[in-house]
Amino acid sequence: MTTQLEQAWEIAKQRYAAVGVDVEEALRQLDRLPVSMHCWQGDDVAGFENPAGSLTGGIQATGNYPGKARNAEELRADLEQALSLIPGPKRLNLHAIYLESDAPVARNEIKPEHFKNWVTWAKANKLGLDFNPSCFSHPLSADGFTLSHANDEIRQFWIDHCKASRRVSAYFGEQLGTPSVMNIWVPDGMKDITVDRFAPRQRLLNALDEVISEKLDPAHHIDAVESKLFGIGAESYTVGSNEFYMGYATSRQTALCLDAGHFHPTEVISDKISAAMLYIPRLLLHVSRPVRWDSDHVVLLDDETQAIASEIIRHNLFDRVHIGLDFFDASINRIAAWVIGTRNMKKALLRALLEPTAQLRQLENDGDYTARLALLEEQKSLPWQAIWEMYCQRHDTPAGSQWLDNVRAYENAVLSQRG
């Protein structure tokens, strides 16, 4: 521990103690909050099923930065590099297209054995795993419909894929001793004016009921469903809207996934957390950064990221909210993207934990909105960075921008050698 860091830490502790905040307790609480990193940032959502295929489903990874992972070994190596630069507990979120098999495997026939290497790796790296069926980038999703498809055989294919995915998810939870959150998102929708909006939603409702009909141990597996406003090629109608999935999660008591980019640009998911928590048992968050649409830019330490973190902490939702990330930027170093976004999410959580919430809530209850605003603004100037640097030091990760040196060295030694 350097003298300079220690001095800054002691001064910061005193400053926070003066406003009633126990810094050590804040760091203990931060270690209770894993952030689930998404594997697909590492290869632009290509996966291993058909890496040369086109990305469909109304989503898009833009850019052509060199060095993306081309197989599971490279992706895991890149993830290890990123994980080493991020302090505190982490998880990894996998999509079904990241299976490993010597022979082609139909999506409705995926099995736990196709992900055993991921489980072995997760154990070695002390990570929990989360999962997602991949209802996109496939010939049977080419017309824009999956679980709500009007064709019975195609719809059943996707139902069976999601059922198989749930068993993989439960396998993760059983093997790793921490429940896997499996999120169902489908791109189903239409480009232009839609006459029958009801029938596809009825089919989606029935399909989801069939998907979750097999009872699985909640200690191993948690179901989540995710809405979206629109996607490329589905601008006019999305079957799985916010209202649809809010109703589904409430009536079926599944988890609800709120993605920061899946709403109108003037909406924020931070304001939806407390409302949803009144009706559903759990929330899954996909923290992202939409720029004018669901662009999935790298997460910043901006107002909305901070507001999301503050909602979790202020309402003590540690055990009911699962924090995941969802962005994919192919225009910058992909490892740096992981590190920047995940560290920013953790910084936001730390800043929320360092807030004198009880004092602020009392001012609010007393109607002293002047003092509430004044103290909210003054606390932004408190030396949270010194606390963050100590947290990084305790977890053997770089405290400041020194992590970029590690990324550059890895880029020169490893990424630059890839075709």
Swiss-Prot record:
This is L-rhamnose isomerase. Its cofactor is Mn(2+). It comes from Klebsiella pneumoniae (strain 342). It comes from the Bacteria. Belongs to the rhamnose isomerase family. GO terms for biological process: L-lyxose metabolic process; rhamnose catabolic process. GO terms for molecular function: L-rhamnose isomerase activity; manganese ion binding. Homotetramer. InterPro entries: L-rhamnose_isomerase, Rhamnose_isomerase, Xyl_isomerase-like_sf.
